[in-house]
């Protein structure tokens, strides 16, 4: 192989989704300074994930409801007097 063209930090990295406490050890060049001891007792560079296939609603089939009631009631409260003005014109 040609020297000097391949990344030097290619190593096993623990990608961890904290919302479902699941992790995957994958060879990667992901830049991270954190480390974590995994189930096998070894210490790996640690890369935290916000969402993964284990927690994303598209993959899990579970729906998450967004709280829009507060936003809708704020909108209605703000513009409740406008309906009468529009009817008068």
From Swiss-Prot:
Keywords: Ribonucleoprotein, Ribosomal protein. It comes from the Bacteria. One of its GO terms (biological process) is translation. The keyword Nucleotidyltransferase does not apply. GO terms for molecular function: structural constituent of ribosome. GO terms for cellular component: ribonucleoprotein complex; ribosome. The keyword Ribonucleoprotein applies. Part of the 50S ribosomal subunit. HAMAP family: Ribosomal_bL31_2. PANTHER family: 50S RIBOSOMAL PROTEIN L31, CHLOROPLASTIC, LARGE RIBOSOMAL SUBUNIT PROTEIN BL31C. Belongs to the bacterial ribosomal protein bL31 family. Type B subfamily. This is Large ribosomal subunit protein bL31B. It comes from Actinobacillus pleuropneumoniae serotype 5b (strain L20).
């Amino acid at each position: 192989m040609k020297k000097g063209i391949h990344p030097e930090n290619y190593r096993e990295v623990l990608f961890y989704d904290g919302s479902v406490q699941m992790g995957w050890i994958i060879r990667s060049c992901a830049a991270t300074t954190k480390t974590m001891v995994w189930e096998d007792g070894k210490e790996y560079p640690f890369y935290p994930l916000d969402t993964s296939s284990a927690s994303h609603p598209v993959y899990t089939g579970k729906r998450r409801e967004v709280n829009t009631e507060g936003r809708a009631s704020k909108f209605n409260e703000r513009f409740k007097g406008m309906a009468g003005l529009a009817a008068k014109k």
